[in-house]
């Protein structure tokens, strides 16, 4: 799936190899970039095609992101297959990412699928709330946001964007822009965040009611709806309960009296 962090992971692998193995030559490109280069070189002479293959094979590590973009391109696949074999025969490293597992990839020669399956395949799971929160905090630091962002505000962002790394980074960029425009605000609260992202909740949650809000919040925090409705005072449950109550007020415009009855 898009936004799961595949590109980030491959770039991290590239940076790690280059930082720790100085003698290794690494080539990183997207599947689309490789396909465009192959299509261009196929218009040229046989000698130039072989030269292109040799140039790629001079690398010790080849990393291709979104390899599915090479599907249904017969001539491009032939070039790719030759390069793939060369790396295997010379005991070199190959890293690929795709939007599905090898056996589900269509538009590739069976020989390539077999070779894909020879390697180690790892499915990247959707982010959990803890990981999403860690990414948000790191991105806030990377973007050098001066204002303090409260934990409730961070949880609010995590609740809506924990399924997409790109959206997480985009949301922090939006927050950064707002912070630069409002330097007098030293603390960014959940109230500020909810106003800043007021265009999100309806499309994200669909038909809204208190039950739906409780279900979404409880799922994100890994607790039951009964826990939100109960009297337990553990930190995670209290935070989830407060988030659900706040969303009920902000999204459904319920009064405090109504919220008291519903929680």
From Swiss-Prot:
GO biological process: DNA replication initiation; regulation of DNA replication
Compartments, as annotated in UniProt: Cytoplasm
Spans annotated as Domain I, interacts with DnaA modulators: 1
Positions of region (Domain III, AAA+ region): 1-179
Region (Domain IV, binds dsDNA): 180-263
Annotated GO MF terms: ATP binding; DNA replication origin binding; lipid binding
Family to which this protein belongs: Belongs to the DnaA family.
UniProt name for this protein: Chromosomal replication initiator protein DnaA
Organism: Mycoplasma mycoides
């Amino acid at each position: 799936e898009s936004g799961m962090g595949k590109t980030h992971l491959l770039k991290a692998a590239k940076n790690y190899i280059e930082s720790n193995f100085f003698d290794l030559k690494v080539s990183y490109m997207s599947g689309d970039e490789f396909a465009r280069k192959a299509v261009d070189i196929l218009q040229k002479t046989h000698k130039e095609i072989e030269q292109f293959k040799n140039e790629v094979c001079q690398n010790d590590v080849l990393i291709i992101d979104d390899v599915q973009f090479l599907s249904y391109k017969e001539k491009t696949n032939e070039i790719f297959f030759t390069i793939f074999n060369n790396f295997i025969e010379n005991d070199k490293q190959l890293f690929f990412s795709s939007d599905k597992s090898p056996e589900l990839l269509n538009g590739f020669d069976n020989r390539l699928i077999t070779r894909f399956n020879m390697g180690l395949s790892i499915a990247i799971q959707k982010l959990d709330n803890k990981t999403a929160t860690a990414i948000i905090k790191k991105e806030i630091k990377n973007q050098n946001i001066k204002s303090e962002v409260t934990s409730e505000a961070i949880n609010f962002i995590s609740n809506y964007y924990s399924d997409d790394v790109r959206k997480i980074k985009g949301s922090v960029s939006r927050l950064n822009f707002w912070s630069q425009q409002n330097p007098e605000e030293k603390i960014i609260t959940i109230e500020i965040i909810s106003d800043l992202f007021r265009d999100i909740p309806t499309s994200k949650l669909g038909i809204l009611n208190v039950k739906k809000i409780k279900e979404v919040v409880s799922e994100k925090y890994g607790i039951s709806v009964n826990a939100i409705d109960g009297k337990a005072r553990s930190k995670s449950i209290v935070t989830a309960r407060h988030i659900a109550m706040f969303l009920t007020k902000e999204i459904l415009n319920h009064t405090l009296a109504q919220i008291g009855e519903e929680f």
